[in-house]
Amino acid sequence: MKKVLRTGMIASVFLLVGNLYSAMAQTDNSSIGSLVPTADKAAIRAILDRQTDAWNRNDMEAFVADTMPDVDWINIVGMHWTGREAVLKAHTVLHKGIFANSRLLQPEITMMREIAPNVVVETHVNRIEGAAAQSSGAAYPDSGNLITMVFVKTQAGWRIAHAHNTTIDERAASRDPAKKG
C-alpha cells in the first residue's frame, strides 16, 4: 500500500512539473508581445505620415490631432509635457524658433508590437533637416532621433498615449555592448 501511495505521489509530482514546464513554455514565448495586424500597422503608419506632413507645414494642431487628451510626451532634452494642450503649446513655440524652417523626413519604423489588447508599442527613427542652431549654439544633431510611442486603440481609432524622443549618439551606438560579438 505504501509503495502504491509513494508511486502515485511521484507520478503526481512528475505530472505537476510537466504541466508547469508546459505552461511556462507557452507563456514565455506567446505572451511577450505579438504581431500587429496589418490593418492596425497601416493605421499607425498613417498617423506617423500625418504627423510628418503636419510638421513640414508647421501645423502643430494637426501634429497633435492623433494624441490622447492626456498624452505624455518627453522630448530629446528631457522636457516632459503632459496633455495634448501642453504638447501643442511646446511644439508651436519650437516651430516659431528652432524648427521654423525644418523638414521632418519620413520615419523609419524599427519595431511595432502589441503588448496588450489594443495597446501597441512602436519605435521609429526620424531625421530633421534645416533646424536652426540650438540655444547653446550647437547645431541640431543630424544623426536622427529614436522615438518610442505607445498607441492605444479607442473608439475613434488609434491614438498616441505616450512618446519619448532620444537623440541618437552615433559614436556611442557604435560601441553598443548588446550589439558587439
List the predicted regions and their residue ranges:
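A short gly/proline-enriched turn/hairpin at secondary-structure junctions
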Residues: 72-85, 95-101, 133
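Short, low-complexity N-terminal intrinsically disordered segments enriched in polar/charged residues
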Residues: 22-66, 70, 175-181
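Bacterial N-terminal signal peptides that target proteins for export
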Residues: 1-10, 21
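Hydrophobic pocket/interface hotspot
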Residues: 51, 62-64, 71, 83, ...
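Surface-exposed, charged secondary-structure patches
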Residues: 90-137
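A mature extracytoplasmic/lumenal domain signature
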Residues: 67, 77, 124-128, 149, ...
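C-terminal segment of classical bacterial N-terminal signal peptides
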Residues: 15-23
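Short beta-strand edge/turn micro-motifs at domain boundaries
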Residues: 144-171
